[in-house]
From Swiss-Prot:
Organism name: Mus musculus (Mouse)
Keywords tagged on the record: Acetylation, Isopeptide bond, Phosphoprotein, Ubl conjugation
Sequence ranges assigned to domain PEHE in this UniProt record: 798-919
Basic and acidic residues compositional bias, start-end: 450-461
Gene name linked to the record: Kansl1l
Transmembrane segments: none
GO cellular component, as recorded: H4 histone acetyltransferase complex; intracellular membrane-bounded organelle
Name recorded for this polypeptide: KAT8 regulatory NSL complex subunit 1-like protein
Amino acid sequence: MTPALKEATTKGICFSSLPNTMESDKMLCMESPRTVDEKLKGGDTFSQMLGFPTPEPTLNTNFVNLKHFASPQASKHFQTVLLMSSNSTLNKYNENYNQKKVMESNCSKLKNVLCNGSSIQLSKICPSHSENEFIKKELSDTTSQCMKDIQIVLDSNLTKDANVDRLHLQNCKWYQKNALLDKFTDTKIKKGLLQCTQKKIGPSHSDVPTSSSAAEKEQEVNARLLHCVSKQKILLSQARRTQKHLQMLLAKHVVKHYGQQMKFSMKHQLPTMKIFHEPTTVLSNSLLEHTEIKPEVNILASENKFWDDTNNGFSQCTAAEIQRFALSATGLLSHVEEGLDSDATDSSSDDELDEYTIRKNVAVNSSTEWKWLVDRAQVGSRWTWLQAQISELEYKIQQLTDIHRQIRASKGIVILEECQLPKDILKKQIQFSNQAVSLNTSVNSQVPQRSEEPLPEHDFEMSPSSPTLLLRNIEKQSAQLTEIINSLIAPLNLSPTSSPLSSKSCSHKCLANGISRSASENLDELSSSSSWLLNQKHSKKRRKDRTRLKSPSLAIMSTAARTRPLQSFHKRKLYRLSPTFYWTPETLPSKEAFLSSTQTPYTGSPFSWDNWEQSSRSHLLREQVSKLDSSFHPVLSLPSEIPLHLHFETLFKKTDMKGELAENQFVGDCLISPPPVQGTSSLNQWRNGYSPICKPQIRSQPSVQLLQGRKKRHLSETALAGERTRFEEFAFQRSEPGSHCNFTAVSNANVTSRTQNPSSQNTSRRRLRSESSYDIDNIVIPMSLVAPAKLEKLQYKEILTPRWRKVVLQPLDEHNLNKEEIEDLSDDVFSLRHRKYEEREQARWSLWEQSKWHRRNNRAYSKNVEGQDLVLKEHSSELGSAQQGTAESPFELPAESHSLCAQDSLSLNDGQEDKSLRWERRAFPLKDEDTAALLCQDERKDQTGGTSTAFHDEVFCSTTPESGHPPKMQLDGMEEYKSFGIGVTNVKRNR
């Protein structure tokens, strides 16, 4: 761990940041990569990498000093200055030779060649000790040709080296490939130089022996120069690779450093932080589906204010300090990115990338632009949804019209049989037609004769045994069979969808909206097939009409279609539209099903499930709001269009206003602001230490159980009064004009003032809790509540089962068997036995007479009937005694009874004239006189029935058995009614 990180962990929060500009060029002034690795182990060099202020190290004099190498201020062509010291190898050779001007000219030419070929400028070669002048001589052709060869070799090597560097930057393998390529370039340069000198200098040496020593010296100088240039090139490539490697190490260290800074700061603050304050119940996050500003934006947009310790838990940490830390981190990371990525630098050769502007993380001081973008995106998404719905509806309408057209085209014609009229109707029609024809001219005089002739033939044909009727029935059956066979066998020109077999095979193919595919394809073929079926049916109908014998009367008659039998009917297809399936809260998929359905490797994290669950809940909540308010659409309406009264209703329903202080101390923070101030509400929630997204994850399970337990408790009247005043405070604060931030600030101020005296509130809370809580061991239940609920134990009732009992068999009495019962067949016994039946019959007769006279509205008859009933009851006992006394002389009984009746009638006429006498008893079989009297009475009734009144309807004649005279009529203004008992009723019934 770096010393800066150790200091950060020991001191607490101390954000150590790196400077915005790095002096990484100092690390390149080293001899080899080995020295880099050795010096990386030390602390000074590492601090130089990180940009900490340290004294600059002394540079090696034997190495080339590279100024501004690979720095952002460098140009596209690297400018390198070679500063040679007095101990260099080139100066040793200059001491031994006296040709200074020749070497200067050669060096100047070599400098120009190298500048044009490899873009490397050799500025000065300064000898320290030897300053003698040399003789100027022109360069020979061999040296110029050698310089050209050196230029070609350098150009090829430089291009190869550039390609190799690109490969190394892509594959990140520096040491293996570059070592081999460096050796390859060294050997190639040496071989090319030797070949040039052998070819060009060899023949000139023999011709000019005086200048051999000068040529050899020039060759050695050129070889040394070429060796130095190649070595410098190798060192340049190594420096470039080392720079890239150091930049990558620096980027890794910076990322690790800032990650550890943030991690250790959070670890330091978490023990001192309080648990994120959460209210008892908050409206669901999906009720107000607002956009959330990122924490970085909140950090940049926040002002330099001290955060309260009770709200967020950060101790003495200002927003400005964190802002400085964030700015330094972003600046350093962007600088490292520019060093590593070629697209992010200004030295890119691509024209398109030069025009690309790098987007910076600009602080958003006001969220108006962000909010405008979010609103624009919401409106655009709703517009696309509406267009998709309209296009889908148009497609469905077109599909339904196609199906309707297909159904109309494939609908067959219902063919009814002709009605067969009955024979009598046929005859009448034929007669009417004959009469109409007879009225015509004499030219058509033969038409009735022809119409009369088919009558016997038609009757013969309509008979069940006629051969024509049998042939007609056979023809009907054969026509039906051929129709069935034709319907089963599909014709060749029909489409596959119209045949029953293909429809079965294609039944499983359905469209997205539940309509069968066969119903929406091949409409032309179906219309042609339907026309073919219609033609076939019409041809069959014509054939049947030709074979069928018709009478001219059948065409004239018009009958109803419901009375005619069905001849043929084309069975139509059944189309079913499957209903659309909507998700309900019961049918929502579970978390396991959602995670198992997704197959991407990133679905293991709970963020995807949380986002999906939040979106599904928001969709269901929007549907509920649309049910409550008809002006709100679940899709087209924006979240800001949710009515405000719904917010308050859900708040009052869900928030426990009767809870304790710990539950209600953050009511102001949990309230969701109206839609126009959404950004400030989310910022306040982030400042208070929680966000709507991470809220369900932070809340622990015991705290939820504790809150649920507190909700179920009952508080006393004092607690209710305190909460009522608290609620009035809350209502007053809500009614004040101002933004949501002011409201939350007031509520937070109230919360802080309440938390200043926790001891008194804790004691009062404990007292209220002890008063309101129940002790399960000391609960007294009155007996009046327990008595009806007490269970009574039923007594055991023994069920009696049948048993066998012993029966003592006793012999039957013999004297009872010996005695024989003798039936008494005397008349007295029979009369006594039948007396009760006679009384019943008399009562029935009297009731019948009463109802008969009542229908005729006769009041006198009702009185007579009442008197008659009374007389019958009075003399019933006398009649019984008279029957017993006169059993031997049955013919004397009617006379005595008649005399009694006469006496009674006289007495009744004196007292009550409207009462009738009792009936006269009859002895059966009747005598001839009695039957003659009855017949005479009937004849008189028939004669006087039309003119007599209601009192003269029935007149009964009674005679005594001794005299054969007819009975006398009373002429005192009222007729004498006499009853003849059972005999009269029997005679009337017989008639």
